Amino acid sequence: MPSTKTKENFPIVISASRMCDLPRWYPQFLITEIRKRIENGQKIHSLVIWTKHPAALLNSRLLDELVDLKNSGVQLYFQITITGMGNKVCGYDKLQRPWKPEPNAPSKEESLRILPQIISLAGHPQRIRLRIDPILQVNDGKQEYYTNYEECLDTVEKCASLGIHNYSFSLVEPGIYKKVDHRFRELGIELIIFEETFRAKIKQNFNELEEKLGVSISACCIKGWPVSSCIDGELLQNLHPSKSKVSLRQPHSRPLCGCTASIDIGGWPPKLCPTGCDYCYARPLYHSYTDD
């Protein structure tokens, strides 16, 4: 007789969301979407939350919901982004106006201050992936050079002291997303390609930090770096209080992406994100300089 394979029904991993900062701008939507799935009988293994606004996770209504989920057996895993560019003037545009690439994001210092509380909410620093993402370099409207690379090195040092082990980075370069190229042309700011010498420097410095601090720094979808998994089913299994299994299937939704299966609840088209990062490939609400 032919063998029959039994389909395993794993609990799901929910991603909220790669496409928009739901905790900051759409917390009620986030709560509703999770509750709807639970009411429909879906079992949630882990809720992976992505945000540049860690303080939003401590908003009373959202916090109460997250604590309830955690107490019900849903693992909380946080992807926290700190690039060093939050609400920071990093140069000038073509009209000589101060340029903030992340105009409505919190400062690096604000985010670092709140991290111990997020670690407490997660239950362990291993349930946080710190994203120094992206790294960019530009010549601004005054032809002055800027990169946030050194800020990212400093961020890893500071976060490692809190016990955070996993880090992700990407590189913003011209020619990857037409929307991003168009935005920077509008601003009169030149995105610069990362030449091989700079890439080699990044690799060397990150390797040195890994050895010094005992951390792991992974590239997110960058040619020439090993494939990595921002959502890593095996890690989520190992970190889950009950060690329950989850799908390890890799959909490969983007080239060089090693993420395992998850359901992203950000919706399509993506929700408008008022954080307004100039390098965003999704649907940012760009900052207007008319009132500056």
Regions found by a protein language model. Name each.
Residues 7-191:
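Conserved AdoMet/S-adenosylmethionine-binding subsite of the radical SAM
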Residues 285-292:
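Short cysteine/histidine-rich zinc-coordinating motifs and their immediately flanking basic loops
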Residues 125, 149-169, 233-261:
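Structural recognition of alpha->loop->beta junctions
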Residues 196-258:
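A C-terminal junction/extension of Radical SAM enzymes
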Residues 56, 225-227, 287:
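Flexible loop/turn segments at secondary-structure boundaries
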